[in-house]
Regions:
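Conserved ABC ATPase "signature" region
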Residues: 24-31, 111, 123-140
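H-loop/switch region of ABC-family ATPase nucleotide-binding domains
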Residues: 204-205
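The feature captures the beta-strand-to-loop junction immediately N-terminal to the Walker
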Residues: 59-61
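Conserved ABC ATPase "signature" C-loop
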Residues: 222-223, 238
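A short, surface-exposed alpha-helical micro-motif characterized by mixed small hydrophobic
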Residues: 210-212
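Pre-NBD coupling/linker segments of ABC/ABC-like ATPases
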Residues: 2-42, 231-246
Length: 246
């Protein structure tokens, strides 16, 4: 049975035809029926399935719909049409640290995130040292996260999500975290998770990274499925299309 099943999925957004400067202006125009919208389809009738243990990349130019698809699979959004079925626990690495309480320390946020993911304190006690070790944040573990750099927040988020293992890891451009050495640590950890049977769904503009991590690539172009197959073949076709200006 597929671990991810996407059937005839479309995602529609309503975009305002004119820009409003303030929330008050937007509300007044909306109530007076003076605000008009254009329909925009980020995805149109996309279907595919992913088997347990597969490593799959979603590729495409900016605005192609790949990140929207990842958010639908992660349950962050719901499709306008069609269905998305996920048969397993998913760890979404879409906006690292988005679930943190900025007033709390790293220590407190580790336990908070663990609770959100359904793990009790005893479980998080067992994994706490590994999380902080990997994130390299022992010197700042009791400092409020609001004082962290964006890179430190991202490191903590990646460490929590990948230490507390899930069936599916859904990643959006996350290997740009920190310096080169930390990026390599992230890459190695993802390789370990793949070896352990975790299913990977990966969004990236780095074609070389896609080829290294993923055996399969799904190419989304202007909201449509344009290619699906071995990552090297699909990536080469995508690059060739970009070079032709398509």
């Amino acid at each position: 049975m597929p671990i991810i099943q996407v059937d005839n999925v479309s995602m529609r957004f309503n975009l305002a035809q004119e820009k409003t400067e303030t929330l008050k202006e937007y509300t007044v125009k909306l109530l007076k029926h003076q605000l008009f919208f254009n329909e925009f389809y980020a995805l149109q009738d996309v279907s595919f399935s992913i088997e347990p243990g597969e490593s799959v990349a979603l590729i495409g130019r900016n605005g192609s719909g790949k990140s929207t698809m990842l958010k639908l699979i992660a349950g962050v959004m719901y499709p306008s049409k069609g269905s998305v079925r996920v048969n397993g626990e998913i760890a979404p690495l879409i906006e690292l640290g988005a679930g943190f309480d900025m007033e709390l320390t790293a220590r407190e946020n580790v336990y908070l995130n663990g609770a959100v993911l359904g793990h009790d304190r005893a479980y998080m006690d067992e994994h706490f040292k590994n999380i902080i070790d990997f994130a390299e944040l022992w010197d700042f573990v009791d400092v409020p996260v609001k004082n962290y750099s964006s890179g430190m927040i991202a490191r903590l988020g990646f460490s929590i999500a990948t230490e507390v293992r899930a069936d599916i890891l859904a990643c959006d451009e996350i290997l740009s975290v920190g310096d080169f050495m930390f990026q390599q640590k992230c890459h190695d950890r993802m390789e370990q998770m793949l070896s352990g049977g975790t299913t990977l769904l990966f969004v990236s503009h780095d074609i070389n990274q896609v080829k290294q991590l993923c055996r399969r690539a799904i190419w989304i172009d202007h909201g449509h499925l344009r290619g699906d197959g071995p990552s090297a073949e699909v990536c080469d076709a995508y690059v060739a299309a970009m070079q032709r200006g398509e």
